[in-house]
């Protein structure tokens, strides 16, 4: 039984109440009684609106389901379909042209194109690593990944391999020729670096040259009479620090003495309370809020064991340099932090209220998140004894990503919520900025109206093709069987979706004012493929794109040196490449599209993916991790990938492509494989052979068999209930 404290008409879990009063409020000048009174008023006023929006989702889905059921044997008529969506208020009139007016936004969002990390906030070590990933070693990123092939004697091995190291150095030199080329010759032939009369000089044997663009030399860091120093370069708004130490093990092998090339990497990071975490009760929520508070205060620490040694990981300080003219330059040492709240659907037992029928009910989790992540973020706006030594925003803003919104009314509700939270926290109106995830079909189709609803708060739009695919399937669940999961990336609607997001953002004035983002690279070990393919995102006009790790951030950062995103956006501005009809193209399969073995392959792939993710979610409370697929390729899985897999199988089940017996048989085939893949984890609980005794196995099965009935295909209701069930059985 959760211990609770009464705060007005709120019944607050004591763990949350004590955290707020003893840790979060001190240093904010907010009176505790006034705070809790304000929270109660926000909950009372906005809960009915939140519920009404969810009711609208269900009503629209029911009408769409009915429309498809009545036309299932007819050829698809896009004109009739479009008019139907207009008639029911799903597809809204596009507003007149406008320009966003958000103010007080940090340069990392408005001026700098670069990678964006997403990390589960409940894991302090991951959170610290991500916040510190503003700067990363290119040498380490190349040496430790498959970006450099393990051929021709270049294996990683257990000790330093000079052959591999030389390939790393050669790769880095080639990159520098692209980002900061010399006026003549190549960095590959450089034999020395010096500064003369405020200019960078690069020796090439007995000759010397400078940079092709001398203004790209912006600073250096050197102690008197020391051979250990660094040169700071800049390109497309991103910095490159060349570390020179001829006495270091790597520097000794280099003609210039370069021991590393440090890239400005994760410019921004999203600390996630949503798809990558398991937060099903008050204890979980407070653990996340406490980490978020520590990040904003700058005092979050974590004991780390590595190579038999223990050390304390802390947040990095800012970095100082001398400018070419002898002045001072300070650059941020940490990524600028966003926080992702949950969407409008879920509720939390962290706070209960009277439901009006004598029964207590949980408060909407999105309301709670806005209040408490906003409160903690106040400490990131100032320094002091009660606020910690570091700040996050330098412009007085708090950045909140809001996911899974369906249409402009839901965006407007978020803005009203943020305004009310600002009043409770005593913050100026407009302090809480919003990042809009374009990951639900109704938002995609009405994106311009969604942006207009937040025109004075919006700081980013981002395509999340994983969730967006899940909603694409669920919205048209009754239309017929969908194409296979792997074929979705080549479907008509996806290209239109990605193009429309950029075009509409640019038309609304995002260039130089807000981020336009693109989705995650999920194959965490396949960095060579990422380096080859992910450059397509900045080439498409995105100022940021998601990466799964600090290493991936450093490698992806190279793309923003190779592509001038500002120039790309300038070229794209004024275009409208996607049509509504393309966005309305449902990814339906043709009749008799697959052989039996292809169907079995898809079902086994999806069942294995679902089990591999859900077993860690339910049994261990891990919301985001590398999950080996059926071919043992590590994939970064979160609830978005789970939504796709479960919805596709639910769709095939609904239309008779497979049966419930097929699903059960596949789950039973795949569970032993997942058990084997997790055999080295001492905390792992096998699902086989007693499948019905495994809550995780039953959760995976339920996600598929009940997938068509889940609200918008979301997995949270089943996952949360099953995780709570597991925790109750294992107290």
UniProtKB/Swiss-Prot annotation:
What Pfam family is a match for this entry?
A: MS_C
Q: Which Gene3D superfamilies match?
A: Malate synthase, domain 3 (3.20.20.360), Malate synthase, domain III (1.20.1220.12)
Q: Which CDD domains match?
A: malate_synt_G
Q: Name one GO biological process term.
A: glyoxylate cycle
What subcellular compartments does it reside in?
Cytoplasm
Q: What class of enzyme is it?
A: transferase
> According to its UniProt record, in which pathway does this protein act?
Carbohydrate metabolism; glyoxylate cycle; (S)-malate from isocitrate: step 2/2
Q: Which reaction does it catalyse?
A: glyoxylate + acetyl-CoA + H2O = (S)-malate + CoA + H(+)
Name this protein carries in UniProt: Malate synthase G
- Source organism (scientific name): Mycobacterium leprae (strain TN)
Q: Recall the taxonomic lineage recorded for the source organism.
A: Bacteria, Bacillati, Actinomycetota, Actinomycetes, Mycobacteriales
């Amino acid at each position: 039984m959760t211990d609770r404290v009464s705060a007005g008409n709120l019944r607050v879990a004591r763990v949350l109440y004590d955290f707020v009063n003893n840790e979060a409020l001190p240093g904010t000048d907010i009176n505790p009684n006034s705070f809790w009174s304000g929270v109660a008023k926000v909950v009372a006023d906005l809960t009915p609106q939140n519920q009404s929006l969810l009711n609208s989702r269900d009503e629209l889905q029911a009408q769409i389901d009915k429309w498809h059921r009545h036309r299932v044997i007819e050829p698809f008529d896009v004109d009739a379909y479009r008019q139907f969506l207009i008639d029911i208020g799903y597809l809204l009139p596009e507003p007149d042209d406008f320009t966003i007016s958000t103010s007080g936004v940090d340069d990392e969002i408005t001026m700098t194109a670069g990678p964006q990390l997403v990390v589960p906030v409940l894991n302090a070590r991951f959170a610290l690593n991500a916040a510190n990933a503003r700067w990363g070693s290119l040498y380490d990123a190349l040496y430790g990944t498959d970006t450099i092939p393990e051929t021709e004697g270049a294996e990683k091995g257990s000790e330093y391999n000079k052959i591999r190291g030389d390939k790393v150095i050669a790769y880095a030199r080639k990159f520098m020729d692209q980002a900061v080329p010399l006026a003549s010759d190549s960095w590959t032939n450089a034999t020395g670096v010096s500064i003369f009369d405020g200019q960078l000089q690069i020796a090439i044997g007995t000759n010397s040259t400078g940079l092709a663009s001398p203004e790209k030399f912006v600073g250096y860091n050197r102690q008197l009479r020391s051979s250990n120093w660094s040169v700071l370069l800049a390109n497309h708004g991103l910095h490159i620090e060349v570390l020179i130490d001829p006495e270091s093990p790597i520097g000794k092998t280099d003609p210039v003495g370069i021991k590393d090339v440090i890239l400005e990497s994760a410019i921004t990071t999203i600390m996630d309370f949503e798809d990558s975490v398991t937060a099903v009760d008050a204890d979980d929520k407070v653990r996340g809020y406490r980490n978020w508070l520590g990040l904003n205060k700058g005092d979050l620490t974590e004991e780390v064991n590595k190579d038999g040694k223990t050390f304390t990981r802390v947040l990095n300080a800012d970095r100082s340099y001398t400018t070419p003219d002898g002045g001072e330059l300070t650059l941020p040492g940490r990524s600028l932090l966003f926080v992702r709240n949950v969407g409008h659907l879920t509720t939390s037992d962290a706070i209960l209220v009277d439901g009006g029928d004598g029964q207590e009910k949980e408060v909407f989790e999105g309301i709670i998140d806005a209040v408490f992540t906003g409160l903690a973020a106040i400490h990131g706006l100032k320094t002091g004894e009660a606020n910690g030594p570091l700040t996050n925003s330098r412009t007085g803003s708090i950045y909140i990503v809001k996911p899974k919104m369906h249409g402009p009314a839901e965006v407007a509700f978020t803005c009203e919520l943020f305004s009310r939270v600002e009043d409770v926290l005593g913050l100026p109106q407009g302090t809480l900025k919003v990042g809009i995830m374009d990951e639900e079909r109704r938002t995609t189709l009405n994106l311009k109206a969604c942006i207009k609803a937040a025109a004075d708060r919006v700081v980013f739009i981002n395509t999340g093709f994983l969730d967006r695919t899940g909603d694409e399937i669920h919205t048209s669940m009754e239309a017929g069987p969908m194409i296979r999961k792997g074929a979705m990336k080549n479907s008509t609607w996806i290209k239109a979706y990605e193009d429309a997001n950029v075009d509409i953002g640019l038309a609304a004035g995002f260039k130089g004012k807000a981020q336009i983002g693109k989705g995650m690279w999920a194959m965490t070990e396949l960095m060579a493929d990422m380096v080859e393919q992910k450059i397509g995102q900045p080439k498409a006009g995105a100022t940021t794109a998601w990466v799964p790790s600090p290493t991936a951030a450093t490698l992806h950062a190279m793309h923003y040196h190779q592509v001038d995103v500002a120039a790309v956006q300038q070229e794209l501005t004024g275009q409208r490449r996607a049509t509504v009809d393309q966005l309305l193209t449902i990814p339906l399969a043709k009749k008799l599209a697959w052989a039996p073995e292809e169907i079995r392959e898809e079902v086994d792939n999806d069942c294995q993916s679902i089990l591999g993710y859900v077993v860690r979610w339910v049994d261990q409370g891990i919301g985001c991790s590398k999950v080996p697929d059926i071919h043992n390729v590590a994939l970064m899985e979160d609830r978005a990938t789970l939504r796709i897999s479960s919805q596709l199988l639910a769709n095939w089940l609904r239309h008779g492509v497979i049966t419930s017996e097929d699903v059960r048989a596949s789950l039973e085939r795949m569970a032993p494989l997942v058990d084997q893949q997790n055999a080295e984890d001492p905390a792992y609980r096998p699902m086989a052979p007693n499948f019905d005794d495994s809550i995780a196995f039953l959760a995976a099965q339920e996600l598929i068999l009940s997938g068509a009935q889940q609200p918008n295909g979301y997995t949270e209701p089943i996952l949360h209930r099953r995780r709570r069930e597991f925790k109750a059985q294992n107290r």
